[in-house]
């Protein structure tokens, strides 16, 4: 092999570009807005300026955050001086595999080697120490120019933040329980139980304490107040509903109403609907940390939560347009946290709140997973009965499988919705199953299903039973990012109703439609992600 070549080889971006799936996602935005309008209570009263402005705000924020993934700051990577180190990097950061492929092609062309793919090149080196040594010298002589931040500097920063949280949690749990969470085999029931008990739950507790401290120091107040100010000025929404929408991005459906507690009793029906729908369309910061620890992209989770705020306002104002004059039409400030005496007290209160949330998560998962098993058992029994009846009246054994499961039913019912968001037809049934699980069960179980598919693909590669493209994984990450499920209706009626008992009747009337609106808002953010994916 010759080595008379430039010392570095640059790599182009590996964006997928605009495709027909992006167009389907764009169509999905229009159809979801049309569906929402059809479900609305006062269609002639819809403020279309608010709708258009809110949609443009959502797209602008999403485009800014998506485009940040291109801020990768390419640089020479002289530390990648061998095939082994290049292979290790590709396994750690699969996103750069396309760029490594280009690097190999350029190396082959510049050294008069036959053009090979990355997999073929690695296979050709197996069992040949001399060829491997030559390849190592070749890579050392012309190190690849790879991005410092393959997912972009913003996503890198967010993921590093949640990684720091995970490391802090592991430090705490390792000290208290004398073990290190994160077992290699996630499918072993005992190891899975240990991973959940000593990994996920401590994350909720620690993040609760962290958020409480930030709230006490005024950081959260500043962030929420700023987001609310932007939405209020651009969309013309009232101060109370703008604050609630901004608070929902970070603190969740049960805590956000506390931010506007003095105003809940005097809110209009449109504002109440907006308050509830905002809770259904977002998740809390604690759960964001949990899902990131499970392997879901922290950058996409944060982006989804941010752009869901204007999406929730848009859908809420189509479903229940404002026909009254809100009390806080001008502006309203987020109240200060006067409950904690000092930072230590704030951390202690946050840890206690996190523990209550963790217990709620455990109870919720046990109850709903048990109910799913019960429903599946009933459906299986009905299927056995139908199968027997069909076979008894038929001359030949039926080839139709009547053994149904709740996930199988979801896959059929929600597959059209998955397609509408821009998911490839071949992946719509599995995506529909996950979407149905989110709405009927909860987002936690749905994310666990998505993570399980991702883990199987990582372990088995092309041999994995279920294959979901990166585009589909991104779209589902956005679609699942919300509390829009049937159980949350009761949670919100109980939580908000405790703040204003006289409005419990209104909350009960608005609950189901607000939850459906929250699901539509989540799907709307997924459509926006589908439009921008591969373009920015």
Annotate each PLM feature.
Residues 306-359:
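Long, contiguous bundles of hydrophobic transmembrane helices that form the permeation core
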Residues 224-259, 326-346, 388-395, 406-410, ...:
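Juxtamembrane inter-helical linkers in multi-pass membrane proteins
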Residues 17-29, 199, 405, 481-485:
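Structural signature of hydrophobic alpha-helical transmembrane segments
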Residues 234-291, 343, 432-516, 520-528:
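Alpha-helical membrane segments and immediately flanking helix-loop junctions
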Residues 28-40, 54-67, 204-213, 282-290, ...:
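Hydrophobic core segments of alpha-helical transmembrane domains in multi-pass membrane transport
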């Amino acid at each position: 092999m010759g080595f008379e070549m430039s010392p570095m080889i640059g790599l182009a971006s590996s964006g997928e570009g605009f495709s027909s799936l992006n167009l389907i996602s764009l169509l999905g935005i229009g159809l979801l807005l049309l569906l929402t309008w059809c479900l609305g209570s006062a269609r002639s009263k819809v403020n279309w300026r608010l709708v258009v402005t809110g949609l443009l705000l959502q797209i602008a924020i999403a485009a800014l955050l998506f485009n940040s993934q291109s801020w990768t700051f390419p640089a020479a990577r002289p530390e990648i001086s061998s095939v082994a180190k290049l292979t290790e990097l590709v396994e750690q950061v699969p996103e750069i595999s396309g760029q490594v492929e280009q690097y190999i092609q350029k190396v082959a062309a510049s050294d008069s080697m036959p053009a090979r793919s990355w997999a073929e090149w690695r296979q050709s080196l197996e069992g040949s120490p001399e060829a491997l040594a030559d390849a190592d010298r070749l890579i050392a002589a012309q190190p690849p120019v790879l991005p410092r931040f393959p997912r972009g500097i913003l996503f890198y920063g967010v993921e590093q933040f949640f990684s720091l949280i995970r490391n802090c949690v592991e430090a705490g749990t390792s000290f208290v329980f004398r073990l290190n969470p994160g077992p290699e085999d996630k499918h072993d029931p005992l190891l899975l139980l240990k991973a959940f008990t000593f990994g996920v739950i401590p994350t909720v507790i620690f993040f609760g304490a962290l958020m409480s401290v930030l709230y006490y120091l005024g950081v959260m107040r500043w962030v929420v107040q700023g987001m609310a100010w932007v939405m209020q000025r651009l969309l013309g929404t009232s101060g109370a509903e703008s604050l609630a929408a901004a608070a929902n991005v970070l603190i969740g459906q049960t805590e956000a109403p506390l931010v506007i507690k003095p105003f809940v009793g005097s809110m209009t029906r449109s504002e109440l609907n907006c308050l509830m729908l905002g809770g259904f369309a977002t998740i809390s910061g604690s759960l964001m940390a949990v899902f990131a620890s499970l392997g879901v992209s922290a950058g996409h989770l944060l982006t989804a939560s941010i752009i869901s705020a204007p999406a929730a306002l848009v859908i809420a104002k189509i479903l229940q347009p404002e026909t009254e004059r809100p009390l806080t039409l001008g502006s309203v400030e987020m109240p200060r946290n006067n409950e904690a005496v000092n930072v230590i007290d704030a951390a202690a209160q946050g840890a206690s709140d996190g523990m209550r949330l963790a217990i709620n998560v455990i109870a919720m998962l046990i109850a709903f997973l048990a109910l799913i098993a019960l429903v599946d058992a009933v459906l299986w029994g009905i299927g056995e009965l139908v199968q027997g009846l069909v076979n008894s009246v038929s001359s030949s054994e039926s080839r139709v499988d009547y053994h149904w499961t709740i996930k199988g039913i979801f896959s059929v019912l929600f597959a059209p919705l998955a397609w509408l968001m821009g998911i490839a037809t071949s992946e719509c049934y599995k995506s529909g199953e996950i979407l149905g699980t989110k709405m009927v069960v909860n987002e936690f179980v749905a994310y666990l299903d998505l993570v399980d598919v991702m883990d199987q693909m990582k372990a088995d590669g092309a041999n994995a039973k279920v294959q979901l493209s990166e585009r589909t994984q991104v779209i589902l990450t956005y679609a699942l990012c919300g509390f829009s499920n049937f159980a949350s209706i009761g949670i919100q009626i109980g939580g908000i109703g405790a703040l204003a008992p006289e409005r419990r009747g209104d909350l009960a009337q608005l609950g189901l439609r607000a939850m459906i609106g929250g699901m539509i808002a989540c799907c709307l953010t997924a459509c926006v992600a589908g439009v921008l994916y591969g373009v920015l």
